[in-house]
């Protein structure tokens, strides 16, 4: 559930974890939430589930309500990063430093700008910000504290990414399989919190995974696969239930 603190051990010498440690040290806590592939890895490590894939990028969802874009973009530049395609016609999205890549995004409806550029919008971002947990990442020599969407927030965010980003839909579905295996079941997920917009984000991905022979499930070991498929069924049942009028955490 949102607000919980977790301690996980991460391979501090394995990319891109060293970069995440560097960013956490350089930025103020609360200015961003970890999303994307490394978010999936954090949940998998917490739950003892094998991640489905390697990831090279660090994806940050900026909390503009608590900070400004410059609170993250400034430190990234100080670290030697430069924005990709630096012109006013394209949204700010990616910072690079050699082979290191950091992607930044904001929630819909936020008029966030940096260096006269708008910032890329991420679907289901508001609920991911609202449903954040705190993670202490313990490396071999140091630790950092960051924010990560809780299991439900991560699943909704990944389902939304699958719906809007069809460049590599299989990757998003594999990530969802891992997140469902890591979620802890119906009660731990807190499915009663699902709002109408959450359900809209979830339906396409749930439908895509209804076939238990889908390739996305094959990334999981047998026991984890059973747990994940049971979670998918529980989420699908919750999506089909009438939405409580007070459920507001999923609004964009």
Task: Show where each model-derived region lies.
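Compositionally biased terminal segments of proteins
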Residues: 1-252
């Amino acid at each position: 559930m949102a607000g919980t603190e977790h301690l996980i051990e991460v391979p501090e010498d394995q990319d891109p974890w060293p970069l995440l440690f560097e960013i956490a040290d350089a930025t103020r806590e609360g200015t961003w939430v970890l999303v994307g592939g490394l978010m999936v890895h954090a949940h998998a490590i917490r739950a003892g589930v094998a991640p489905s894939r390697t990831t090279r990028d660090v994806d940050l969802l900026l909390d503009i309500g608590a900070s400004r874009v410059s609170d993250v973009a400034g430190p990234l530049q100080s670290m030697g990063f430069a924005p990709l395609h630096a012109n006013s016609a394209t949204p700010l999205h990616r910072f690079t430093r050699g082979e290191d890549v950091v992607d930044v995004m904001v929630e819909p409806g936020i008029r966030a700008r940096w260096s006269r550029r708008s910032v890329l919008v991420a679907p289901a971002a508001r609920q991911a910000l609202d449903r954040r947990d705190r993670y202490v990442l313990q490396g071999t020599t140091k630790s950092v504290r960051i924010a990560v969407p809780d299991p439900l927030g991560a699943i909704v965010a990944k389902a939304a990414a699958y719906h809007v980003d069809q460049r590599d839909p299989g990757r998003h579905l594999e990530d969802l399989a891992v997140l469902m295996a890591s979620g802890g079941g119906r009660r731990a997920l807190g499915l009663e919190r699902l709002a109408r917009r959450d359900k809209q984000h979830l339906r396409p991905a749930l439908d895509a995974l209804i076939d238990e022979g889908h390739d996305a499930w094959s990334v999981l070991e047998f026991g984890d696969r059973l747990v994940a498929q049971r979670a998918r069924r529980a989420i699908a049942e919750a999506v089909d239930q009438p939405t409580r009028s007070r459920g507001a955490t999923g609004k964009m």
